[in-house]
Amino acid sequence: LDASKCADCGACKNACPANAIAAVGKDLSIDTGKCIFCGDCATVCKMNAITFSQEYRLANMTREKLIVRSGEIYEPERPTNREFLRFCSKSLKIRQISAGGCAACELDFNVLGTLAWDMGRFGIQVVASPRHADCILVTGPVSRNMLLALKKGYDAAPHPVWVIACGACAISGGLYQDSEETMGGIEEILKPDLYV
């Protein structure tokens, strides 16, 4: 985000389907916890104040770190929590719970087990039951119909269990954040330990 190039026209904010852009004058910020990375904001910005990089490390331990402000260079957060580092140092058993999503994040997660990415080589394995899981990876905006299933899945896991919010929908509700049929993400239900 380059505030010096911003014409303060509001086109980027109006083009954003996820309401991820905040603008106070020429000071811009993008909430990557809401952003679906469609690129519409960059396309409509005639001044090129918004551009997307090739940075793929988008995970953070806190929700606030997902907000990128003009003039800041995005730097991925390094995990410093000793318990988290110890937790991830051996093997990791993940139970993925789809809480009413469109399947986009589920597909992205599933591809991590293929030959090209092979998360198993790092000791990461998807398990069929939350009873065998070290962490719960949640995708989707948490529809009202999936709320009970999500809570039961979390409760069934041996504690302490880590919670990963994967994708804009799980983090903030994404495109469905204003829907009465969703909970607007998992933060009000389960506190995520990691945001992806």
Residue ranges and their predicted role:
Residues G10-A59:
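Iron-sulfur cluster-binding cysteine motifs and their immediate structural context
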